[in-house]
């Protein structure tokens, strides 16, 4: 199914009362056989399993990395799109770091978002910047 873009699900007040609902509108449908989706999902799972940013990360995440070069005088843009958990997705994300050198850096941000969402690490560690492995996966060239 293809839906209209919506960055928000809903807006509520501090008591949980609905202020505005952003239920996405169905725009079109696509018929893609399940076995083809299975191949795509398996590939996206392998991307994450073989990405340095997700080493020793036991939560099932699927995604795709990418870099986009603008000019040779500036670092490439780092990109990561993904969803979690892999087998029953609850969240989807897209991370773009302008001039971020590498997709691994964008994937590391996604890992921190997932860690925060699913309480996989102390939230104070994310806020203070100590949640990742000391920057060992950060790439600068």
Language model segments and positions:
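Active-site beta-strand/loop architecture of penicillin-binding DD-peptidases
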Residues: 1-29, 35, 41-124
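Short, highly charged C-terminal tails/helix-capping segments
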Residues: 124-141
